Amino acid sequence: MPSHNWFSSLTLLSRLSFQVVLALFLVIVIAPARAAPVSLEGTVTVDTSACFADAVIIYNLASYLVGNYVIHAAAIPVGADIGRYGQKVTRRDNWRWNLWLNTISLFLPFFALSRTLILLAQQVRSDGDGVLAALLHGALLVVVRAPDWQPSTRDEVVYTRLPTKFAQQDDTPYGASLPEATIVLDAEGEEHAYQPTTADDHLLHGIASPPPGYTLATPVRKGYAEFLIKKHINDTKRLKVHYRPGFIVTLLSLAQMVIGTVSLYVSQTTQIPRWGYAAYGLSVTPYVIMSIMNLLCGVFVDSYTCAQLLRTPILEESVRRGHTNTEYDGTIGTVKEEYLPQNWGTEPRRSRGDYVAVRMRTEDRKKSDGSKDSETILVVTLDGKSREYRLVCAGSGCEAAGAEGTAKPVEFAVSAFSHDGPPPKDTVRRLEAITPRERTTIISLFLLAMILPHVVVYALTGYRPNHSTVAQRAWMMAWLAADQFSACSTLGCWILWKKKHNVIPDGVQRAWYAGLMVAGMGGFVTLAQMYLQDQGYQFQTC
């Protein structure tokens, strides 16, 4: 019990919102500023020693960085995500991913631009359907068949892709040497459809304990799950899915917008005459723009602290197995009556594509060699004719199948995700296609956000260098360029995933963004140097 409490405490600590911690930090750091009559910018006026003056300048620099930059990084939406990263939203260890997002956004604010716009577009796409929004944002789990799935010991209707020439095979009499067969999941028909997981890996609303042969999974390619929701589940538009209101994100975004706008306004008289278009106050512009986007996200996009388990035909099938440890509680959605397992039909019928409904069951029999060992027999019935096979598992580590001198086991393919076979690929592509509303939302806001920083710089400075050095101008412009390039990279990766479902390795992506962050780090160093020069910092040794 103590170890369980310790684990629970760690889990609680890991889930503490970074926004809450930052809000408390701001109270602690900024509140004492009332006791120091020193403006955020301009010349520091103190009547004490130079050491105290320098300390106040450093304090003001820290406050300037927190108010204009750090708040934005803390306010990015982390209760929802896009593409294949949606599976990280409700994981117990998602704080690592969130910390990585916060770190990139600190140095490259526009890194989160495409991500935020896509989240807004997905919310528009869901059209008020809470279940669909939870799916698109990464807060939905489903039950799927596992690789070791087998039919029940009693006859049940199973939709399968039959082996080649199945209809031409003769019935196999009991006692004869049985051919071998395996049951495999249709990996080709459900490519990138889901990622297996466990209840221990996620913060889950309710209880999910599937029986052997089944596992929890996070939908990866959302088209498969969206098809299932629209075809097999009763109307979900009236179903309310709990989500976390974005109060803290909204408040922090508003705070950063106010502080950043004031800093930008003050820079016209205190910085631009000296530094020209390299003025460090201008670097706040992308952060203010992103705070506006974060504000929209906080107001309109659902944010989730735990996963929801969707009730599907496969989940209903797992319940019918009657395993003692099977338990589900807190599920959402109801399966349409005609898609419940007990209503899959008394007579086999054709399903989608090349899948056929047959009757299947397994039996344990003693081996015919006289030993006491038993073997699993698969009985497949189609059109009133039954065929028997010795069931062997597929993959490495299984009992030898198709050994020398024996025929290769025949394969019965089943869908892991959908009980009656994978949906047509054209249908999945249509559901995953970028809709006109998504395209309009993303393109219009993306172009506006990308152009606006240059408009602001030109309007305030005319791109005049004034007294700034070449190095200062180079670092500040490289920072802006790397920032905007990170936005294009994020958008490009998402489009590549939507179109081709190619996965760029995490290591490559992290290295790429780490390289871009070098420009951001150089920009912060240049910013700090210019700020200290403006404040008359004397570099005193106290």
Residue spans of the language-model regions?
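Alpha-helical transmembrane segments of secretory-pathway, organelle, and plasma-membrane proteins
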Residues: 2-542
